[in-house]
Amino acid sequence: MGINTSSAQSSGAASIARSSVNVKSGNRHLSSNKKSATSALEERASRPSILVTFLVLAGTILSLYIWPILSPDLFFANQRCSFKYKNKGSQRVVVEGKNGVVATEEETCSQIGVGILKAGGNAVDAAIASGICIGAVNSFSSGIGGGGFMLIRHPNGTAHSLNFRETAPAGASKNMFHGNSTLSQVGGLSVAVPGEIAGYERAWKMYGSLPWHKLFEPTIRLMRDGMPMPKELASRIRRPEFSYFKTHPDWSKIFAPEGVFLHVGEKFYRPALASTLEEIAKFGPEVFYTGKIAERLVKFVQQQGGILTMEDMANFSVVVEEPIYGNFYDREVITCGSPCSGEALILGLNVLSKVDLSEGTSILGCEMTDIGVHHLIETMKWMSAGRTVLADPTFYNNTDHVEQLLSLEYADEIRNNISNERTFDFTHYKAEYDFPNDHGTTHLSVIDKDNMAVGLTASINLMFGSQLLEPETGIILNDHMDDFASPGIVNAFGLSPSPYNFIAPGKRPQSSAVPTILVYNGEVEMVLGGSGGSRIVTAVLDTIIKKYKWGKSLLESVESPRFHHQLMPNIVYIDETVEIEVLRALEKFGHIVDLIPVQYPFSEIQAVFRTNGTLYGLSDSRKQAVAAAY
């Protein structure tokens, strides 16, 4: 993975072709007259109204005079000035407390976590209870039919990473899909062995303080008594690909009991799932992995063409290991290693730690400059290239690759290959292989009164996973077999899939998850992580850089326009709320930009932060999320 430095060092004399900047809406290019992102925003900006002007002035007054009074610690802590961007009008709620904070992607589930803390539970108890709730409510993201990762830091300073990522069944093989991506995404063959319940029990046995059954009771009641339909869930079930939910007997009884989808605020019920959770609460994970729940799941998956067996379920195990560590701005950074993507995050932080991101012309206020944003994007491209050699270390001895990604010398080498004047095509970044895009996911962050911290990232992969809902148990099964690479498929850039991530029995696919904890002067300062599949790593990097390098509040670090680049395709993705100066600046460097509409958010962050003895929580409004604290 050596780097050729000549192309970057000689770029000053190069003639740079200015790439056009395109705007897409979802998967569709906007105008047929090839209007650039810059011209589109210019046209939009040229039609101001008196109402808009009034609202902007009112918002400015509110932010400058009212918000600091309401929350002075959060507004001024480590903040030098304020970003310029268009308020997208969504709910932006920062919570604060002294005893505990829980940030999830659904307000009810955040409140359940705080309820557990109030009942004497700790951060691990709260994370498990909130995670169970998210899987039942936002069932398009996660659930007990999936898996994930949990990062825990004890108040005494010890930390553990729990890997309960799903595993490939014993009957799986690298050629099992024969190049048919549909088989890996929908139906029985797409289902990997679920790990979430095993992971929760292992964390609870290590650190939990409340009885096991207490962690399930709030969600059991919620699913029996009915949960008002949240905005995000109502939006997801109405996507065209799920229109059949209205007529399918297993799905319609939950989301369309009268033949039409429930509206926001109308109650939905999941009694079958409530009964399943009751059994797990009473009898423990054994009933899920070796008892009647396992029998039902195995029978159902096999009826749908899958290869899951009782032996696969019984043999699932959780991997408990040391996290990986880095340093950034005098903070200790803790995250999880492969098959997480923590190595890529540490690489990005190492690269940017020695870069003056205030160099250049200010484009978003403060010290956020054109050259600074360009360096952030270029670093993301190098991170993505580094991810192509990561995989389940149980099956692939990638110690040399991991050590290289974590080394400061490699970060120096990359820094020398980032030009202040231009971007490059994908060959410059030395990616060795293609990698599949993972999807979906949920993340939650918790800090309790004793400063125990937990970051939990869980997933069933694509929305509603394999789209298999086992009717007797109410469990929605994952499609994480799609996160493996399959041989014989060369991507549009001529790269073959990574052999390190090929399917093998018992193997766990590579993931983009990066639950992360930052420690300052021996105490947890921040816990964060994200959802959004392959865009998680860059979203976490983006948030940390804004908070520490650009001195932003927690609020603006999470809510301001987010940047993403995964090398392939060679496109910068940005929230459409970005100001026009940013597009002009990126066009100057040769970047191609895809503006992401507000209604199609591509990554979401849940973060909690401690400063001056006060805890703050913020759940990303891109997913209609709200945190809770007390």
UniProtKB/Swiss-Prot annotation:
Catalyzed reactions: an N-terminal (5-L-glutamyl)-[peptide] + an alpha-amino acid = 5-L-glutamyl amino acid + an N-terminal L-alpha-aminoacyl-[peptide]; glutathione + H2O = L-cysteinylglycine + L-glutamate; an S-substituted glutathione + H2O = an S-substituted L-cysteinylglycine + L-glutamate
Binding site for L-glutamate: R165, S459, N461, D483, S511, S512, G532, G533
This protein's pathway: Sulfur metabolism; glutathione metabolism
Quaternary context: Heterodimer composed of the light and heavy chains. The active site is located in the light chain.
Record note on modification: Cleaved by autocatalysis into a large and a small subunit.
GO molecular function: glutathione hydrolase activity; leukotriene C4 gamma-glutamyl transferase activity
GO BP terms, alphabetized: cellular detoxification; glutathione catabolic process; proteolysis
Lumenal side: 71-630
TM region(s), chain numbering: 50-70
Free-text function comment from the UniProt entry: Catalyzes the transfer of the gamma-glutamyl moiety of glutathione (GSH) and other gamma-glutamyl compounds to amino acids and peptides. Major GSH-degrading enzyme, catalyzing the hydrolytic release of L-glutamate from GSH.
Membrane topology: Single-pass type II membrane protein
Protein name: Glutathione hydrolase proenzyme 1
Protein source organism: Schizosaccharomyces pombe (strain 972 / ATCC 24843)
NCBIfam families: g_glut_trans (TIGR00066)
